[in-house]
């Protein structure tokens, strides 16, 4: 493979064996595609805003004389860009403008149009998605998590014998629409069929059929076959259908007309008997009279002569009834064919319990069930039933639901109306009865063919439709009220309900979540998350084991490893690496097509439904050079089972071994050697890693690090190829290659870097360039690293030298022993940025003021504030320091005589304000790195606000000038080249300014035209930049739009540097987590023969029981990788010949039998030098999951690095110098510092707030709460007999109010006694008992 210039800086050695047929798709595409589908108008109107508008419009007035029609919509430009929105705390959104047409009909002449008015109407703001798939809502980045919900359609299920005490299996069917009422059919223990609507009380199922205009006769005709009997001359003949006799016991001799007996009475009829009967061609059979008695009639019988009904359908036949029928002239009698085995009498029985006899009665019955207590009228009952399943406004199956419905009940087409039809309801009942009869299976609701993904776009569309429907009602009212001649569309529409619905969804829906921004991985994983919770989904409490379990259809679609531990396990999942959603919202995964035993490179995406029909080989099946299977029998999957089949039976093959797992799990090297429980912890803990000060690429990775860092959007990736012409810490400028330019543009790309900003988790986001001026750049190259990336590779932690051995009990129970060197080198130091804000409001007593003049505060406390009362940038502050001085007016208080006297003398009114300054919270120390001041429109800006504004303007001006200068240089450069080619003197041209340069005249017309084009381009550029700057200036100087009652907001940003310390939590990538117990001086750490100490000591007992052996293999491989780097460093120090260095690097890349080809010979000398420089710290290695390095490859690497093949080393005790008695596994492991820092958790309460009712101290660090002295702690003190301590704990230290105050007074007076009284919680208990009506009184003894 050919590497670009920047990829050659450091190449990761890959141990993957399988060729990569398909690159990992863009990781955020689910989110971006879904939202694009929502915003971009689509011609069919199937989805997005277009679909919402078309479903609600046109809105007709009640009279029908006017209607409001929808024409089109457009989305305007956002006012602020993403960064400005984050700083100002506003939503990144754009206005939605809709073109509407009001059509008014002529009342006098119906059908003629009187007036048409068209107008563009504002319909609120629509939040926009950023390039990285997030939304900025009120200044914070949020992610809308996709939801996995039950697909609309029809489902057949059974209760597995749990409902009825007899254990009988009861079957049920449920029609779930996308919106509208649910329709359930269910059997009871007596085999009657019932219907429920919206889970209300059940009615016999025949009621809904009657309401659909079916008579009893029709119903029996639909659900039963008939058996016809003919009664002639006292004989009863049955029309014979031989196959129906099978399995029955003959109640009489079955014989032909000539007397040949086929089956004797009492014998069971077998298939052989039936064959003989069919061969004979017998059509009728004489049966005894008893055989027909008890049969059920299939239709109504009427006496033709009198017109009276002799018998009704579903009546049971008796001898008397039979005689009457014959008398009335009915010699042929149709009865229902009922058979216990495969054709039960369910509908017949149901009709017997159904009390209704006409359509109206059925409708009334349904109305009573839906609206109990309301008097039913014919029209109301009719309208209610019509609206339930047959009205487009109230009921929609959606295209997905219709497709699923049709395929399940066996229709030929995929499409159809969104509402139900009579036939649909009958089909569902037919399938349910067939399943009860033993034909067909019930559905598996956990199958991914029955669960679909609902992404951002779809949820936003639903929410938007809700808003539109609210508006629709109001528009109808207004259309029928007003004088339509004077009204415009704008007067009819109120945008408030729409923007309220959208805002509510983005701001407070359960699926709109605060983005997890610890590191790039946590961002990507959050956007790829799939939740079964949320509106219309499951709840934690109701979700059983089956829903949470890994299902066979998860393969390649949902990761079986990555899911949270705890109550949400299995309900929140992650998308697999290659998975995507199809048009219907079902998850698909790619497979390579196999033709006649040869695996092709053609890739098909299959959904869970399609996959079941095929035979699919695993990705690790052995293939020959020509892509044929090596083995005769191949492990494969077919119809949800794992099995072995022949090579010619294979139809598809997995694309990649990593296809099964999610991105986070694919980052774990040697995953195949870890137990799944630990791998789960590993993938979850990588998301909690805090970006370290200096990112360090993992020595042992999996090869997916680069893709993930690029796709996450934290790095800066080149949009087009070119050459770096300028580069500093905040900007990179690339001069684009001629062939990649758009004709007529300057051809310069400017990338601005993000510097030291705060993430959602208070970690630090900072980008640093990785390129230098003059370097060539290819499209897709990484130009700048973000947090937790190193030369474009994801780098969540640090490579530390680890030894597995016990060390004086300091690594007991997963504790971790760390060397002081790690602290000194700042290997695990992180920067955290906190935002504190001070708000000045308008109160009833007057407005709050931000000032440095604060009552009762000494000079020293104000030392870090400027004259406006705001802390200066760069100040180092600790807890309790004032950051922003603020005073609040306080109500008039009763003055003491002394104060009155002072007032009278000095006339001062200053004491009627109280100090409400913003102070640094407890246990925080840091440096102020930024201050932002926001002032309400119309409020005068203070000095500090003006300074901030001036600085922002200065920076903006400088930025724009630099950008303009760069682009100008590009244009002028091309103009000079043009003029020089035309014979102008280069030196003279250098003296000309832009104006003169571009107004030269040339002899050749085409050249002149080109120069004029450049001049026009230059003018355009200048105008554009002037406009841009003016825009920016306006945004900076205008007042801010603050919440009602807020005059000013000051935001202060503190940066805190946190070194690693005992109590911090660390982890590897294999679920091996622990807390640092102590940090040991370097000289006391174990060291090897060369005197190199280890950085970290882990307990070997943590490995065997947890079965995460991957960490041991990683340690060995890390040692080899580092060793090879050290050898390269030695060669460079000794200044060896370049060809030796080249040969060694080549040898390192050629170890093992991998797919990777690195053509070291084609590298230039400079490239080799640069590569070697970057490999000094160790040769980075990729060992992909399920396709990684084998044991002997690790041993070969160790050998090349000059280490023993065992990977074990002799160590010496740092304190005594004695050798440890056996060799120790030493190597390099990638360790992460997790965002569970002791600084954030350590807390002690002195005096603080109490709970209002119980008067006990509050709990938790945020409330400055106390530690709960619980039940078990009380037992412990009881066991020690420490009565006084216990009394103190339960009274004065907790909720004895009088005792507390007395105790305080005593301490102040130096009288160390305590007088415990009655705890307040006893009073609460008394009140609670009294509330039950039991009076308790305490008596003094």
Curated annotation (Swiss-Prot):
InterPro entries: DNA-dir_RNA_pol_bsu_ext_1_sf, DNA-dir_RNA_pol_bsu_external_1, DNA-dir_RNA_pol_su2, DNA-dir_RNAP_su2_dom, DNA-dir_RNAP_su2_hyb_sf, RNA_pol_bsu_bac, RNA_pol_bsu_CS, RNA_pol_bsu_protrusion. Coiled coil: none annotated. Keywords: DNA-directed RNA polymerase, Nucleotidyltransferase, Transcription, Transferase. GO terms for molecular function: DNA binding; DNA-directed RNA polymerase activity; ribonucleoside binding. GO terms for cellular component: DNA-directed RNA polymerase complex. It catalyses: RNA(n) + a ribonucleoside 5'-triphosphate = RNA(n+1) + diphosphate. The keyword Nucleotidyltransferase applies. The keyword Transcription applies. It comes from the Bacteria. One of its GO terms (biological process) is DNA-templated transcription. It holds the Pfam family RNA_pol_Rpb2_3. Its EC number is 2.7.7.6. Belongs to the RNA polymerase beta chain family. PANTHER family: DNA-DIRECTED RNA POLYMERASE I SUBUNIT 2. DNA-dependent RNA polymerase catalyzes the transcription of DNA into RNA using the four ribonucleoside triphosphates as substrates. The RNAP catalytic core consists of 2 alpha, 1 beta, 1 beta' and 1 omega subunit. When a sigma factor is associated with the core the holoenzyme is formed, which can initiate transcription. This is DNA-directed RNA polymerase subunit beta.
